[in-house]
């Protein structure tokens, strides 16, 4: 997985690949620097030279814009990356009486490290609201959920309430179940029984 490259070299290589795929010819050195916020053209030159030496790029020194991706090496590395990830369904609406991963519920997929699947079937749900902010789960976050229908006290779960999914901490008492928000301004939900859709095992957040 590009073990022999620095993060900057990977960034440059991927930019060149995208540029060629889109425009049909390679970018100029200055375009690479401008697009990747590299102020020094010599830094770009040095990294391109190293990519050539490591077999990822080929360049004709007598021609301008003569960078060429060596596809066999690039594709081999990309395939290795793909083997290490798996596309996980992103669930949109949740409907009562319908399996959580029914095709009608799935809006898209998102690649996650394959290790997540060793914990069972997983799906992603986008958080709406601020009921779990004190656990660091914010509005708009994507939570990674392991599909299961049971929970232990204190688990953060996705539960089905009034035909929609809610994210809360689960507590079973002698005569009721408490779904507790992690927001001191909100009250817990008290119910006799509830359908557990899964346990939250991770979180993904986009930083703009």
From Swiss-Prot:
Keyword DNA-binding carried by entry:
yes
Instruction: Quote the Gene3D superfamilies the UniProt record gives.
Output: Umud Fragment, subunit A, Winged helix-like DNA-binding domain superfamily/Winged helix DNA-binding domain
The record's InterPro entries line, in alphabetical order, gives: LexA, LexA-like, LexA/Signal_pep-like_sf, LexA_DNA-bd_dom, LexA_repressor, Peptidase_S24_LexA, Peptidase_S24_S26A/B/C, WH-like_DNA-bd_sf
Q: Which SUPFAM superfamilies match?
A: LexA/Signal peptidase, Winged helix' DNA-binding domain
Catalytic residue list: 131, 168
- Residues in the DNA-binding region are 29-49
The reactions it catalyses are: Hydrolysis of Ala-|-Gly bond in repressor LexA
The UniProt entry's GO biological process terms, in alphabetical order, are: DNA repair; DNA replication; negative regulation of DNA-templated transcription; proteolysis; SOS response
Q: Which family does the record claim for this protein?
A: Belongs to the peptidase S24 family.
**Cited function:** Represses a number of genes involved in the response to DNA damage (SOS response), including recA and lexA. In the presence of single-stranded DNA, RecA interacts with LexA causing an autocatalytic cleavage which disrupts the DNA-binding part of LexA, leading to derepression of the SOS regulon and eventually DNA repair.
| Quaternary structure and partners | Homodimer.
Q: Which PANTHER family match?
A: LEXA REPRESSOR (PTHR33516), LEXA REPRESSOR-RELATED (PTHR33516:SF2)
**This protein's UniProt keywords:** Autocatalytic cleavage, DNA damage, DNA repair, DNA replication, DNA-binding, Hydrolase, Repressor, SOS response, Transcription, Transcription regulation
Where in the sequence is the signal peptide annotated?
none
The EC number of this protein is: 3.4.21.88
Indicate the enzyme's highest-level EC class: hydrolase
This chain belongs to which protein, by name?
Answer: LexA repressor
Site annotated as Cleavage: where?
96-97
- Molecular function via GO: DNA binding; serine-type endopeptidase activity
Ranges annotated as spanning the membrane: none
Q: Does the keyword Phosphoprotein apply?
A: no
């Amino acid at each position: 997985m590009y073990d022999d490259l620095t993060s900057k070299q990977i960034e440059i290589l991927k930019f060149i690949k995208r540029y060629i795929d889109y425009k049909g010819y390679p970018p100029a050195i200055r375009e690479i620097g401008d697009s990747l916020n590299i102020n020094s053209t010599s830094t770009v030159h040095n990294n391109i030279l190293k990519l050539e030496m490591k077999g990822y790029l080929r360049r004709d020194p007598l021609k301008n814009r003569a960078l060429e991706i060596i596809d066999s090496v690039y594709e081999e590395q990309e395939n290795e990356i793909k083997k290490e990830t798996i596309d996980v369904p992103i669930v949109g609406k949740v409907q009562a009486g319908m399996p959580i991963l029914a095709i009608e519920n799935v809006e898209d997929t998102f690649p996650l490290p394959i290790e997540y699947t060793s914990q069972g079937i997983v799906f992603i749900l986008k958080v709406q609201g601020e009921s779990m902010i004190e656990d660091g789960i914010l509005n708009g976050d994507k939570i990674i959920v392991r599909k299961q229908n049971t929970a232990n006290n204190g688990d953060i779960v996705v539960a089905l309430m009034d035909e929609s999914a809610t994210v809360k901490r689960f507590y079973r008492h002698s005569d009721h179940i408490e779904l507790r928000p992690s927001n001191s301004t909100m009250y817990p939900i008290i119910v006799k029984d509830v359908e557990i859709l899964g346990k939250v095992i991770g979180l993904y957040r986009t930083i703009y």
